[in-house]
């Protein structure tokens, strides 16, 4: 028997995550600690499923989980997919397409992605493709606002794992990290 605990974050095009979404909330961390303690005391395992689109803080709690699975917002079939992986019906064979930093601010791109503005889209319109333009005429066009209307990419060649590898920065999970249930060997002939 195992406990499967799922944590999620919502974001998408035009609705990036807030800076504080990188961190686990106090109640999420408390839940991980409580479930881990209870299951380990009974000789059972805890699997944490991350239903996310970009990294969250894992360094402080990953030792409490026996496995961490990144689902990366898989949609309505997530339950079936995770069940198939955890029961060994399918081989997960996934590798991380990004680096999980130890803390927010460790990656140079963090400075360019703060969702620090008020999102005004009506909740009923999310995902509908409906365009809500005001009928009000502006006398002067609005100046584009950084991190709302555009984003500067200032990392140069040090995008993603290149920064962490080049500067030897400690990470929680490196780019390409991942396991599968398959055993294999590489051989050069």
State the predicted function of each range:
Residues 1-39, 49-63:
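Hydrophobic helix-and-loop "lid/oligomerization" segment in the mid-to-C-terminal part
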Residues 42, 51-189:
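Secreted, periplasmic, or luminal enzymes acting at the cell surface/secretory milieu
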């Amino acid at each position: 028997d195992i406990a499967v605990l799922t944590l999620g974050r919502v974001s998408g095009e035009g609705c990036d995550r807030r800076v504080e979404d990188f961190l686990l909330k106090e109640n999420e961390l408390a839940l991980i600690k409580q479930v881990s303690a209870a299951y380990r005391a009974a000789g059972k395992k805890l699997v944490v499923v991350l239903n996310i689109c970009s990294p969250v803080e894992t360094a402080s709690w990953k030792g409490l989980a026996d496995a961490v699975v990144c689902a990366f917002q898989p949609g309505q079939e997530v339950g079936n997919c995770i069940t198939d992986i955890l029961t060994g019906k399918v081989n997960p064979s996934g590798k991380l397409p990004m680096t999980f930093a130890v803390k927010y601010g460790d990656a140079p791109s963090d400075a360019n992605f703060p969702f620090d503005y008020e999102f005004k889209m009506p909740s009923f319109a999310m995902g509908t493709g409906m365009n809500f333009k005001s009928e009000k005429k502006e006398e002067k066009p609005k100046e584009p606002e950084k991190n709302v209307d555009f984003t500067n990419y200032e990392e140069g060649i040090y995008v993603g794992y290149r920064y962490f590898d080049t500067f030897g920065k400690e990470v929680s999970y490196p780019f390409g990290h991942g396991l599968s249930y398959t055993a294999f060997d590489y051989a050069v002939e």
